């Protein structure tokens, strides 16, 4: 009779311990708020909002062989180049691996300036700009992201560097 009573007490203790352990595991898992998994954008500055984690690992390969590590702080913004990235939050436990894709955006803005044009790269990737007069190629210039070049011509083509 005593053995059955002790067995019941042991069973209750095991069940309570398992419930507490499962709750603790859920409590220490990193909580990823943003960005969403499989997020795609052409913006290069990404806002990471993560709770219950100490660090963020970002890599361009799924094995995380050469990750960049960032200390997590409220409103962490990271500037990334176009490409596909894998990332995870690390605390007591690790979050699941998520993906993030930054698409290349080619975008030239022209401003007429007297006899010339100012060509501004408002995309997110460096460009080679071919300048034409009619059908003749007259100049090639390199324009970095946010940079501007003064050119003379009547046709302009942005090409990936």
Please describe what each predicted stretch is.
Residues 65-72, 139-143:
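Short beta-strand segments within Ig-like beta-sandwich modules, predominantly Fibronectin type-III
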Residues 77-86, 148-156:
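Surface-exposed, short loops/turns at beta-strand junctions within beta-sandwich domains
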Residues 30, 34-50, 111-124:
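Short coil/turn motif common to extracellular beta-sandwich-like domains
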Residues 21, 101-119:
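Low-complexity, Pro/Ser/Thr- and charge-rich linker/hinge segments at domain boundaries
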Residues 55-61, 130-134:
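Predominantly extracellular/luminal cell-surface or secreted proteins
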Residues 92-104:
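Extracellular fibronectin type III
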Residues 8-27:
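Hydrophobic membrane-insertion alpha-helices, especially the h-region
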């Amino acid at each position: 009779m005593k053995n059955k009573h002790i067995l019941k007490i042991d069973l209750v203790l095991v069940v309570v311990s398992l419930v507490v352990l499962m709750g603790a595991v859920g409590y220490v898992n990193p909580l990823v708020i943003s960005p969403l998994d499989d997020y795609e954008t052409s913006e290069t500055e990404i806002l990471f909002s993560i709770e219950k984690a100490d660090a963020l690992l970002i890599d361009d390969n799924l094995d995380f062989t050469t990750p960049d590590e960032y200390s997590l702080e409220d409103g962490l913004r990271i500037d990334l180049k176009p490409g596909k990235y894998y990332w995870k939050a690390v605390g007591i436990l690790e979050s699941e691996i998520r993906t993030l894709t930054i698409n290349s955006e080619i975008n030239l803005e022209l401003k007429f300036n007297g006899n010339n044009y100012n060509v501004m790269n408002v995309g997110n990737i460096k460009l080679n700009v071919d300048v034409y007069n009619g059908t003749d190629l007259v100049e090639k210039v390199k324009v970095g992201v946010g940079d501007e070049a003064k050119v003379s011509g009547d046709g302009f083509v942005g090409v990936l560097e």
